[in-house]
Amino acid sequence: MKSAEIREAFLRFFEEKGHTRVASSSLIPANDPTLLFTNAGMNQFKDCFLGLEKRAYTRATTSQKCVRAGGKHNDLENVGYTARHHTFFEMLGNFSFGDYFKRDAIHYAWEFLTSDKWLKLPKEKLWVTVYATDDEAYDIWTKEVGVPAERMVRIGDNKGAPYASDNFWAMGDTGPCGPCTEIFFDHGEHIWGGPPGSPEEDGDRYIEIWNNVFMQFNRTADGVLHPLPAPSVDTGMGLERISAVLQHVNSNYEIDLFQSLLNAAADAIGCANEGQASLKVVADHIRSCGFLIADGVTPSNEGRGYVLRRIIRRACRHGNKLGAKGSFFHRIVAALVAEMGDAFPELKQQQAHIERVLKNEEEQFAKTLEQGLKILEQDLAGLAGSVIPGEVVFKLYDTYGFPVDLTGDIARERNLTLDEEGFEREMQAQRERARSASAFGMDYNSLVKVEGETRFIGYQGTSGSGKVLALFKQGMLVDSLSAGEEGVVVLDQTPFYAESGGQIGDCGYLEAQGLRFDVRDTSKAGGAFLHHGIVDSGTLTTGAQVEATVDASVRQATALNHSATHLLHAALREILGEHVSQKGSLVDSQRLRFDFSHFEAIKPEQLRALEDRVNAEIRRNSAVEIEETDIDTAKAKGAMALFGEKYGDTVRVLTMGGGFSVELCGGTHVNRTGDIGLFKITSEGGVAAGVRRIEAVTGAPALAYLNDAEEQLKQAASLVKGSRENLLDKLGGLLERNRQLEKELEQLKAKAASAAGNDLAASAVEVNGIRVLAARQDGLDGKALLALVDQLKNKLGSAVILLGGVQDDKVVLVAGVTQDLTSRLKAGDLMRQAAAAVGGKGGGRPDMAQGGGTDAAKLDEALALALPFAQQAL
């Protein structure tokens, strides 16, 4: 059976047993911030097992995509060198949420594996393990299924603590847990290894193919196990492993799925498929990279993006080992889509995007590799000993995006090691700097703890009455606030919108007889709305009835910008591709800011197309439709939800442009798209790797922006004595004249340097037949000094040269050594000494080096170092 047939057979089998087929969840866990990537089938059902979520079904079956690379579960360094380690794998699973338990789970597993209708595995080839004290499971296997006792193994606490066992599973130190039973396949005595529980169990003869976890206890902090009222089942069978068994091979890389990827990788690289470890690395990594990018991860220098970058660069490195010329990795995506696109449609939908991201990262890595190697070479040139300092490793990582494992590979090739402790110290220092930079003061609002909820009545209008439920001053609950005092007011109901979803909180005022409280901002604490402000007059007390009035002009201006972000989001997905997803936003009364996933800068013509598309929807003046429904119905209608956002049972769906934009949103919006008036992008740029930002204005601020631009054009035209119509021609003429003058200046500098070179050559000192020259040349930049050193090398023959000068209050230094002397002394060594003398740094090649510093008063001392440097070396 092919891998795709096995996957479908598994899902169909459990559908026939009353299970609901559930699609694989994203590789980015939606409900577990502690998890880097989805790494097991049960991840998406965690809240079901904890009793926090109820679904419409109590039986489920999935083929879950999983990644293990980075974090606690990290197989990266083993991939390619063993038969069964992967960064990406599929986990087939069946789950029971308080429905069936051990008996049915065991019988289902045995039936699927051994019956003639399904996989037809020889029963005598299967071994089973159970937890040592799980007599119930043991009896089901032996007395009902009929597994002989000699192929049953009880596994005790083999990890040094109670319930610490290969056959006892726990979600954590406390919480749901229980025994598990595992099924092993015996590949035969021609392969080394012993049965589970034996000293030789790590061999490849007996391979675990299916694990059934029985969650039947809740472990409390004292270590006591208490029976769960509704026990559950969580099972997992690796598709790659069961495919290897059914296809009669002993390595996952020999199954049909991997063979097609290995062949595609060999074609892309230009090598033969001969089972090389590096080729296996590439074939494995295209799966994890393709699926991670399809799920919205982009290469970066932190978090999930950094893990993705490491995997891509590891694949590129291994491709280069096999002789790849130029970028190749992105060319394997088509084979991945052909192999797995039917089961996972997101691969087909995102194929072009995946290829672009990979190609872009490959090209960027080639530049990084070249630049990083130059820096590393400079540091290694002056290395004393065989350990690369931690600060060097950190500089390569932090400044140049050089993965630490890549630096380690280069070090190993040169019989060097890394100062890993030093690197960790640098990393820790960076974390401390980041923490101290963000800890700038006490946020008293974070201390506010409120019981009860505020009902929001602001969709219907901008005013309403409310009762004061609580008052806070500097985070402390108080009974009253007097004139001049700042505080927080909580009402039972309010028209004030609380900051959420990127939209700022409303401002306005609360009034009662003899009282006015100016509301400067509104936020949320749980279900309560916090009105932040100051008492302008009178005294505000708990229980008081107040009239709440929102600043309607600010609310309306904010609504224009919020509605425009929805139109912009839809336009981005239409013009740039469906890989675009919102990463953050800020909406206030003056502007909008929208962060989104995209791997490259937006071209000017694309920005114009975005503006045109949004303004076209504004001119259509279509009604903004608002509907409240349940989350599943909303998603079925195509409504976009923000990743990681928690939604209640009822959600608010906003539709604009007759379906052009459909999003879940609780913010305030315009009634018709025409109310926005005008949309104008003011800036676009990158804020992080794979994340771009657009800032824009709407309505009156957009018109003011265009008027300002018009006025600046008029002023620019006036400066060049032209008009708006001929401004570009005038500027072009000025730039061309400037280029001519710069060229003439360079020619004059070259003549002056040549003349100076003749004079300088005569002042060189001879040391053991070698000419040594150190001279001060103020006013020349680094480029001019380099040219002068080259000229002096030709004039002097065998020579050591150090030139320096002061330009713009900074010291510029250039050192040169003729090629015949570089085996005895190096320009980089001389430069490091000279630059240090003027309070700076420098380095370079053995024959030419540059540097500089800030202490101009020490320049002559620095130049004086050239002669003793040469004397000592010669």
Curated annotation (Swiss-Prot):
Which prosthetic group or cofactor does it need? Answer: Zn(2+)
A Gene Ontology molecular function term for this protein is: zinc ion binding
Record-listed E.C. numbers: 6.1.1.7
Q: Which GO terms describe its cellular component?
A: cytosol
Q: What is its main location?
A: cytoplasm
| Alphabetized InterPro entries for the sequence | aa-tRNA-synth_II/BPL/LPL, Ala-tRNA-lgiase_IIc, Ala-tRNA-ligase_IIc_anticod-bd, Ala-tRNA-synth_IIc_core, Ala-tRNA-synth_IIc_N, Ala-tRNA_ligase, Ala_tRNA_ligase_euk/bac, DHHA1_dom
> Domain of life here?
Bacteria
Report residues binding Zn(2+): H562, H566, C665, H669
Task: Report the co-factor binding details.
Answer: Binds 1 zinc ion per subunit.
Q: Does the keyword RNA-binding apply?
A: yes
Can you state which reaction this protein catalyses?
tRNA(Ala) + L-alanine + ATP = L-alanyl-tRNA(Ala) + AMP + diphosphate
What GO terms in the biological process aspect are recorded for it? alanyl-tRNA aminoacylation; negative regulation of DNA-templated transcription
Subcellular compartments: Cytoplasm
What are the transmembrane regions? none
Q: Does the keyword Protein biosynthesis apply?
A: yes
Keyword annotations = Aminoacyl-tRNA synthetase, ATP-binding, Cytoplasm, Ligase, Metal-binding, Nucleotide-binding, Protein biosynthesis, RNA-binding, tRNA-binding, Zinc
Q: Which residues form the signal peptide?
A: none
Which Pfam families does the entry mention? Answer: DHHA1, tRNA-synt_2c, tRNA_SAD
Q: Write out the function statement from the record.
A: Catalyzes the attachment of alanine to tRNA(Ala) in a two-step reaction: alanine is first activated by ATP to form Ala-AMP and then transferred to the acceptor end of tRNA(Ala). Also edits incorrectly charged Ser-tRNA(Ala) and Gly-tRNA(Ala) via its editing domain.
Protein family membership: Belongs to the class-II aminoacyl-tRNA synthetase family.
Domain-level remarks: Consists of three domains; the N-terminal catalytic domain, the editing domain and the C-terminal C-Ala domain. The editing domain removes incorrectly charged amino acids, while the C-Ala domain, along with tRNA(Ala), serves as a bridge to cooperatively bring together the editing and aminoacylation centers thus stimulating deacylation of misacylated tRNAs.
Q: Which PANTHER family match?
A: ALANINE--TRNA LIGASE, CYTOPLASMIC (PTHR11777:SF9), ALANYL-TRNA SYNTHETASE (PTHR11777)
Q: What is this protein called?
A: Alanine--tRNA ligase
